[in-house]
């Protein structure tokens, strides 16, 4: 019995040394970065500057980064190894967009120069079905943007400023498949703003009155689908060529508002070309 008391601590100490330090296993953050360029026709109406519809072409740059965590269990298995990594059910997506367009009315006696930058922060829950071939996502996003619209013909009030903030539910579906030996995926995503704020001058109000004299006239307007029905949707196809993933798709962006007795819309139909890059950022959990 006394001999057992001497052997037992030695055995326990050996077992503790053999167990892996699971608490120090790396925690990875998987990032999918997509850089896209879009080009296509656009249609702009802004009754503050002109009652005419202006048609032209738009060029848009999009940088999108989707992040989700991959965690490792801290409980060792019977083989002395930690359990396999588990992917988080939540993703965070950051999107930067910069767009410029050049358009003309039917009379072709004037031009619109349009520029806009927007930033989108989205959070989504995702589900995997059909043996991980189908991925569904749903969540919400916040978007902030600012830009300008300049009419080359107008002498008074030649430009219009754009600034907005909105919150929107979003959803997407992605299906993975193979074309012979080529890996591919088709994806659809959409967002529909429900609540936001928008800067707009009032009907007949000049920017001189607003900024030089400080005459505020309901220039910050709350927006809903009733006075600013807006939709952004994208259908894309990803395909792998060796170790590289490319994207081709369609982006439809329909921004519109009717506030302060003024009408505004910017419709874009863009062909999207992009490159998809996936990588992991490792962290050591203390």
Language-model segments: which ranges?
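Short glycine/proline- and aromatic-enriched beta-strand/turn motifs that initiate or cap beta-hairpins
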Residues: 23-93, 286
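Outer-envelope beta-barrel architecture signal
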Residues: 29-35, 71-77, 86-94, 132-140, ...
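Residues that define the transmembrane beta-barrel architecture of outer-membrane proteins
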Residues: 33, 53-61, 71-77, 111-119, ...
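Residues on the lipid-exposed face of transmembrane beta-strands in outer-membrane beta-barrel proteins
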Residues: 39, 59-69, 75-85, 119-125, ...
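Transmembrane beta-strands of outer-membrane beta-barrel pores
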Residues: 39-45, 96-104, 142-150, 175-177, ...
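Extracellular loop and loop/strand-boundary signature of outer-membrane beta-barrel proteins
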Residues: 44-51, 62, 103-111, 154-160, ...
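Outer-membrane beta-barrel transmembrane domain signature
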Residues: 156-243
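Predominantly the C-terminal beta-signal and adjacent terminal strand-loop region
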Residues: 189-191, 199-201, 221-222, 228-286
């Amino acid at each position: 019995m006394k001999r057992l008391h001497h052997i037992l601590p030695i055995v326990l100490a050996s077992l503790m040394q053999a167990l892996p330090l699971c608490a120090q296993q790396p925690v990875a953050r998987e990032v999918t970065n997509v850089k896209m360029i879009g080009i296509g026709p656009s249609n702009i109406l802004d009754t503050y500057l002109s009652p005419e519809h202006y048609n032209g072409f738009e060029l848009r740059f999009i940088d999108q980064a989707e992040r989700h965590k991959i965690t490792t269990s801290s409980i060792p298995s019977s083989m002395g190894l930690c359990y396999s990594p588990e992917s988080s059910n939540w993703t965070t997506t950051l999107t930067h967009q910069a767009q410029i367009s050049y358009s003309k009315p039917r009379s072709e006696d004037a031009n619109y120069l349009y520029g806009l930058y927007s930033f989108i922060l989205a959070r989504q829950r995702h589900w995997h079905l059909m043996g991980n071939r189908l991925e569904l996502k749903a969540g919400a996003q916040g978007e902030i943007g600012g830009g300008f619209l300049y009419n080359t013909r107008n002498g008074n009030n030649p430009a219009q400023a754009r600034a907005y903030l909105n919150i929107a539910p979003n959803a997407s579906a992605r299906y993975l498949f193979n074309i012979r030996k080529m890996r591919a995926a088709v994806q659809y995503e959409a967002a529909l703003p429900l609540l936001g704020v928008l800067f707009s001058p009032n009907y007949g109000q000049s920017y001189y009155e607003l900024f030089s004299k400080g005459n505020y006239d309901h220039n910050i307007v709350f927006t809903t689908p009733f006075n600013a029905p807006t939709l952004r949707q994208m259908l894309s196809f990803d395909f792998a060529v060796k170790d590289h993933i490319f994207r081709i798709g369609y982006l439809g962006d329909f921004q519109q508002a009717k506030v302060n007795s003024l009408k505004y819309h910017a419709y874009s139909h863009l062909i999207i070309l992009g490159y998809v890059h996936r990588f992991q950022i490792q962290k050591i959990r203390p």
